[in-house]
C-alpha cells in the first residue's frame, strides 16, 4: 500500500513539474550551455537537452558558420540570381526539345489532332452546301412557302379565336361539350 501511495505522489510530482516546465523558443538569446550541468560531457548534453532546443542550436551553428563568410555568401547569391534567367531559358529549351521528340514519335496522332478544327469546319461547309442545294432544288416550293407565310400567320391567329367559346365550354363541362358537338350539323 505504501508503494502505491509513493508511486502516486511521484506521478503527481512529475506531472506538476512537466506542467510548469519552461520552454525556450527559437528566438530566445539564452545560452544553452548555462542550462545544462557543467559536469556532463558534450555528447551527453546533446542527448539530454530538450528536443525543442534543437532548432535553436542548429540556427546558432548556421549563424556562426555564415557570419564570417557573409561577403563571399553575398557574392555567390548575387551570381546565382544572375544565373536564374539562364536556368529558366535552359529549362524552356529542354521542354521544347522534349515536345519536338514527342511530336516526331507520334506524328500521326499529332497531325490528326491539328486537323480536328479543319474537319469540323469542313463538315459545317458540307452541311451548308447541302442546304443550299436543297433550297435551289425546291425553289418553287420554298417561294410558295414564303408567299403563304403571312396568310398562314393570319390563319393561325384567327383559328384559336374561332373555337374559343367551345373550348371554354369543354373545359368547364365536358358532358355539355360532347352534346353540343353531336347537335352541330356536319
Curated annotation (Swiss-Prot):
Keywords: Repeat, Seed storage protein, Signal, Storage protein. The keyword Repeat applies. InterPro entries: Zein (IPR002530), Zein-alpha (IPR051903). The keyword Transmembrane helix does not apply. Residues 1-21 form the signal peptide. GO terms for molecular function: nutrient reservoir activity. The alpha zeins of 19 kDa and 22 kDa account for 70% of the total zein fraction. They are encoded by a large multigene family. Structurally, 22K and 19K zeins are composed of nine adjacent, topologically antiparallel helices clustered within a distorted cylinder. Belongs to the zein family. Zeins are major seed storage proteins. PANTHER family: ZEIN-ALPHA PMS2. This is Zein-alpha PZ19.1.
